Amino acid sequence: MVGSRVYVGGLPYGVRERDLERFFKGYGRTRDILIKNGYGFVEFEDYRDADDAVYELNGKELLGERVVVEPARGTARGSNRDRYDDRYGGRRGGGGGRYNEKNKNSRSSSRYGPPLRTEYRLIVENLSSRVSWQDLKDYMRQAGEVTYADAHKQRRNEGVVEFASLSDMKTAIEKLDDTELNGRRIHLVEDRRGGRSGGGGGSGRGRSRSSSSRSRSRSRRRSRSRRSSHSRSKSRSRSKSRGGRSKSKSPVKSRSRSRSRSNKSRDVSKSKSKSHSRTRSRSPKRERDSRSRSRSVSKRESRSRSRSKSIHRDSRSRPPTVSFKSSFYKFTTMPFFCSDRSASAENKSRSRSRSRSASPKNGNASPDRNNESMDD
């Protein structure tokens, strides 16, 4: 069956039919799987399942290798060139590509080909979830040439359709707006933000923007970056020249000022550090002196207090009889004994003084007396 066969390229070494069955599982029933050296073919029962598989699995990894999933055209034994010519043949409205008169009116041949993005875009609202992008594209061909179609990719129950010309887009709005598609009435709204990146499209492989839009965006970015870099370089050169001029005018003054300021700051920091160190060094000495003085004073006070306490204790510990005895001796014995002792002492002193005074006189008088005795 034409259109239900899929080409799988870039298969890893040692791949089996089971691997391909798992890879394509969920996209419909498969009729046949054929594996060759590095590539293979998978045939589905329905061509819609084949289109969905191409749309979703192209560029995915199989056993660690990225594979190419494309719709197969012609015989499997044909060369890649023959498959390329057959695959991209068809009407321009079916997505662009090579024009072929034989397949001009064939519906299946117009389904494949790279998408052509345009600015004439319509947003299809209230789209049934059972409607695929292929169904939407076929339905919109009633108004004109459809270059791109997508369904349920950005939002659910919403599709995108792009036309080849403005007139085709307007006829689609007039003719197909508020019509019923698969049980739902669709609404067509013009999207003035045309050129958005979308997936899928006419061939199932066109998920990137067209080359023209890419080249335009790249050229604009490059021009903007060049302008910004040019303006930045100009501003930098101006700032550098101004800075160089201002610096070249008075380099000596600025250096001398900076040196003097640095020296002043160093002197101030040194003086501050010295004063802090002096105060720190003096303060412990003062504290030590005050502590030693307070200790010595406290020791002296404690000593004097202990002495006074000991004296007071001694005075308290002495018996009162001593005082009575001393007073008794003073008042009773002193009159009797002191008079005799004093009289004897006085007599002794008198006799001594007389003997001292009389001894030289007697010595001087002794020769006279002797002489007198001799005369007699």
From Swiss-Prot:
Residue numbers bearing the Phosphoserine modification: S165
Bias (Basic residues): 215-263, 271-283
CDD domains, sorted: RRM1_SRSF4_like (cd12337), RRM2_SRSF4_like (cd12600)
GO terms under biological process: defense response to virus; mitotic cell cycle; mitotic G1/S transition checkpoint signaling; mRNA splicing, via spliceosome; regulation of alternative mRNA splicing, via spliceosome; regulation of gene expression; regulation of mRNA 3'-end processing; regulation of mRNA splicing, via spliceosome
Alphabetic keyword roster: mRNA processing, mRNA splicing, Nucleus, Phosphoprotein, Repeat, RNA-binding
GO molecular function: mRNA binding
Subcellular localization: Nucleus
Segments for region (Disordered): 73-114, 185-376
Keyword field contains Repeat: yes
Annotated function: Essential for development. May have a critical role in splicing or in controlling alternative splice site use of at least some pre-mRNA in vivo. Not required for all splicing. May play a general role in the condensation or decondensation of chromatin.
GO cellular component, one term: nuclear speck
Post-translational modification: Extensively phosphorylated on serine residues in the RS domain.
Location of the RRM domain: 4-74, 120-193
Biased composition, class Basic and acidic residues, residue ranges: 79-89, 185-194, 284-304
Family: Belongs to the splicing factor SR family.
Keyword Ribosomal protein: no
Protein known as: Serine-arginine protein 55
Highest taxon in the source lineage: Eukaryota
